[in-house]
């Protein structure tokens, strides 16, 4: 019997954004991302490459206002797609963690796909904006993602000076933590409750 593909397509349209995401968890890291926010595209491309996820993402947002709605809504839709692609989560490892360096920067991420939304985020950035992405939105991105992923995320920049390096290390740590958490390691739902 063939395994069912772990994939999802999610569309969300509001007065602020129009977003379509197609995600495959068991991919090869290819992506086509156009969020309208250049640095967010770069981070999501890195995330997919290192997690091994395939992602097509299109967002048409009210960037004439600022990047808030686009960044937040991209995270909400991506989190929903991850949740849908995971199905009942049978056989997944559930937990993942990684510590990733990028030059002088060092970031840590731990993930629990256990069905409870929570985000602990510890990082400070010197630059307020990088290529259209307000750095204050990095935390908001991960908080919004945790909400619709129904996951607990702990993210922390442990060292570093360069804002680009610190944010990229966070996204790559998240990628490797997610790669582990979604990996199939058994047949059962990884919880004594019998569901997550």
Curated annotation (Swiss-Prot):
It is an enzyme of class 4 (lyase). GO terms for biological process: L-histidine biosynthetic process. The keyword Cytoplasm applies. Its EC number is 4.2.1.19. The keyword Amino-acid biosynthesis applies. It is found in: Cytoplasm. Pathway: Amino-acid biosynthesis; L-histidine biosynthesis; L-histidine from 5-phospho-alpha-D-ribose 1-diphosphate: step 6/9. GO terms for molecular function: imidazoleglycerol-phosphate dehydratase activity. Belongs to the imidazoleglycerol-phosphate dehydratase family. This is Imidazoleglycerol-phosphate dehydratase. It comes from Chlorobium chlorochromatii (strain CaD3).
